[in-house]
Amino acid sequence: RGCNFCAIKTGSNTAYNSFDKLPIIEQALTEYGVTNGDYVFTCFGEIDIRNHIGFHLNGKTINEVITLTVDRYMKTILHLKNKGYNVGVYAPPASSVWSFKAYGDVIIRNQMTLSFNKYLKVKCGENNIMVVDISQQMILPNGTTDTKYLVDELHLSQEAMPLLEDAFKTFKK
């Protein structure tokens, strides 16, 4: 059966806790008929950046918490890869300028996003896992996010679709 390219929503989850959500993720993959020939792209990290990393430093630096978060996220990614799926990662996009109750301002969150994605690419590269990342393309020279790519505080607009289509073209069959 397979789904080749389909979106599977498993609820709002964090990269940090994604390994704990593997039963839900695996159930969704089974229900959608995802096979080992299909690509499975994980998409975690935005919530961590917006609401968790900066607020849960506990004496650590932001980069230390980013490293810890990505390392935990990699357990999820590698688990799926070891199950035989063609795993890829869609890295967190640039942060919204309208995020209320979020950590810091958009410039700080975008710096966090770029650091998160840089380390994520290193770890994925070590394991031959593809990463799709449009965050840098969304960020203006002043460090804020170009609002044309945002429809609200959480979702990308249709203006971002050409960026995504271009980034994912490698995987079209």
State what each model feature region is.
Residues 70-78, 117, 121:
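Generic structural signal for well-ordered alpha-helices
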Residues 1-72:
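Conserved SGNH/GDSL esterase-like catalytic core that processes O-acyl groups on lipids
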Residues 66-70, 74, 158-169:
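Short, amphipathic alpha-helical "lid/cap" segments that border enzyme active or binding sites
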Residues 45-48, 77-111, 136-137:
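Active-site segments of SGNH/GDSL-like serine hydrolases
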Residues 86-92, 114-148, 165-172:
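Extracellular serine-dependent O-acyl
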Residues 49-63, 96-105, 145-149:
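Surface-exposed, active-site-proximal loop segments in enzymatic domains
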Residues 97-134, 154, 158-161:
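Substrate-gating cap/lid alpha-helix
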